[in-house]
Amino acid sequence: MTKQQKTALNMAKFIQNQSLLLLEKLNELDLDAEADLCEKLHDDAEHLFRTLSSRLG
C-alpha cells in the first residue's frame, strides 16, 4: 500500500470515528433531526472505510 493510499484509509477511518462522536453529542443535546443526518453520515463513512479497506487492502 502506498503512502497516499494509507493516508486515504486513515482519513476515512478518522471521519468514521469523528462522525460517531458527533452523533453521540447530538443525541445528548436531543437534536433528533441533526442526529438522524449524522447517523446517515456515519453509516456512509463506515461503508466508505470498508470499501477502501477491501480495495486497497
Predicted regions mapped to residue ranges:
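Short, charge-rich amphipathic interface segments used for partner binding and complex assembly
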Residues: 3, 11-57
